[in-house]
Amino acid sequence: MKRIAIDAMGGDNAPKAIVEGVNQAIEAFSDIEIQLYGDQTKINSYLIQSDRVAIIHTDEKIMSDDEPAKAVRRKKKASMVLAAKAVKEGKADAIISAGNTGALLAVGLFVVGRIKGVDRPGLLSTIPTVTGLGFDMLDLGANAENTAKHLHQYAILGSFYAKNVRGIANPRVGLLNNGTEETKGDPLRKATYELLTADNTISFVGNVEARELMSGVADVIVSDGFTGNAVLKSIEGTAISIMGQLKQIINSGGIKTKIGASLLKSSLYEMKKTLDYSSAGGAVLFGLKAPVVKSHGSSDVKAIFSTIKQVRTMLDTNVVGQLVEEFAKETQVND
């Protein structure tokens, strides 16, 4: 049985969306147990009772505007902190939260702990593309500043995730840059390019420009955390704007526009699915001793369900256990 600890109080739509997502997951998957951390009365308002769902009551929670590290230190009974402690103590196998990103990174690093040999765990997310296959990108903001060694390690982590969770036999790795030529980029990108080219365990396809990301040019995209986060927000904003503009055009158009939209309804629905990040699950702080997954702050029921499904797959494939073994081998070789 896979045991998943969930911060029921994190996110814009908590606890309603969190609990209703859990209800759907419990019905869909018979091999999971959920531990919900938060206000018991509020949780029970939405929970469909199940012997595979436990509520661990606490009145304390970390707010979206709390200073992350300080909040984790001071709010020791916060729902997010208690969920992370459950993982550390072996009472749960993974943690999910839609709450304060910085706080989740802090509890991930300082409570759950990083895998020996991993310098900087990266925030990884699977982003939908027009091909329908998507790509994994990291770092998406766990680390604002990185070295070439960190980015090289992100390529290793991303490839490992793509192979073991998404089932891609030989993931193509691209380096996000301001041009595709080998000589492009700042010193960080140039140094990273050399490291990735020299590593024959990685299928490196070279530099990738931001405009190429959605075309499926690579399965894994490597970036420093500052740039990666900015690109992610840009992709999300563009997708929301496109769908909003389409809706506005259809609603304000004449009868011909509405008839055309009706005829294209299934195609427009497929387009919406392609651009919908909620079906891809959450962002994984990859490189820790257990799955720590950040669901979007505005997650709805569908997004929470997808994140639970994603974590279930991670536990099913034992991707973290395999990663621990992989880095243990590298550590032995380096020693």
From Swiss-Prot:
A family per Pfam: FA_synthesis
Sorted UniProt keywords: Cytoplasm, Lipid biosynthesis, Lipid metabolism, Phospholipid biosynthesis, Phospholipid metabolism, Transferase
EC numbers: 2.3.1.274
UniProt GO cellular component terms: cytoplasm
Pathway named in the protein's UniProt entry: Lipid metabolism; phospholipid metabolism
Chief location category: cytoplasm
Family in the record: Belongs to the PlsX family.
Role this protein plays: Catalyzes the reversible formation of acyl-phosphate (acyl-PO(4)) from acyl-[acyl-carrier-protein] (acyl-ACP). This enzyme utilizes acyl-ACP as fatty acyl donor, but not acyl-CoA.
Name of protein: Phosphate acyltransferase
Organism: Streptococcus pyogenes serotype M1
